[in-house]
């Protein structure tokens, strides 16, 4: 399955690169209004006090119907706002929050993500498969 990601500081980009995912699309300020015409999993960081980055929100405004699940990066120093963008997107678009990871993720996070992407069933519908 395609993995769409946004990396404002490079951490999510490093996470995706380390995971070795080949079918990817990186959201940028320049392409955030482009259409993706296939199901995808979104990986994003969290900015400010738990907000969804604006390019991600713009992308979802155009492409939310293909969104299957979300994973989010954050910093545990932000307490309850850690990776909160993932919760926000999960609730707003009724998709599962696959996982949360800190900064660019650990090796264990990479293995977990690859396993979840590899086993993700596109036909599961928009029901919650795991709660964080």
Curated annotation (Swiss-Prot):
Transmembrane segments: none annotated. Disulfide bonds: none annotated. Pfam families: Flavodoxin_NdrI. One of its GO terms (molecular function) is FMN binding. GO terms for biological process: protein modification process. InterPro entries: Flavoprotein-like_sf, RNR_Ib_NrdI_bac, RNR_NrdI. Belongs to the NrdI family. HAMAP family: NrdI (MF_00128). Probably involved in ribonucleotide reductase function. This is Protein NrdI. It comes from Staphylococcus epidermidis (strain ATCC 35984 / DSM 28319 / BCRC 17069 / CCUG 31568 / BM 3577 / RP62A).
